[in-house]
Amino acid sequence: VADIVKAGRVALDGIVLKKSDQKVEADQVTLDGQPLEAPHGLLAMLHKPLGYVCTHSDGEGPTIYELLPPQWMNRKPSVTSIGRLDKDTSGLLLITDLGPLVHRYTSPRAEVKKIYEVTVDHALEDSLIETFASGEVMLRGEDRPCLPAKLDITGSHTASLTLMEGRYHQVRRMFASQGWHVEKLHRRQFGDYQLGTLEVGRWQMLDTPEV
């Protein structure tokens, strides 16, 4: 916290704080221009870096919650991510303390658009576009096919994949089912929210929708 204050990222009523031990009201404080408190429910967008896990406590590495304001961990109910990205995936994560909002986006019946940027181990083939769009791709251990997905090939080894569902490690498993290994994975859109220019490791407050 002291390092964040020294870096000039914390302000009180628009005035940058100089001391980390200064006592102020949380709802008057901003970090990188964003308010730290949201009394009626919180929704934020985080640009998750590689190497971070989405659990509150995990021995595998640092958690995404270390990137958020410490007082958010004391909210009741506590903040959580809407869905998860694995340790080796970067990109957009939504953070909230609103249970109904989590349910809205993660319910098995929810068809939420998710767009991923993918890099694979060997050259992509145009036939993969039709395969993913067919709605017939089966994942190992599952008894129903994936919903149709839109694949845009952007380079010999790169593509953009749009999904309307969120199964466990779905992108990696879909490519693996067709003989490709995903070497790099980044989510740039979730629902109507896009990362835009949000820097890696930073968060941004969003307007809370009605739930």
What are these regions (language model features)?
Residues 98, 123, 164-168:
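Helix N-cap motif at beta-to-alpha junctions
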Residues 103-128:
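N-terminal accessory regions of nucleic-acid-interacting proteins
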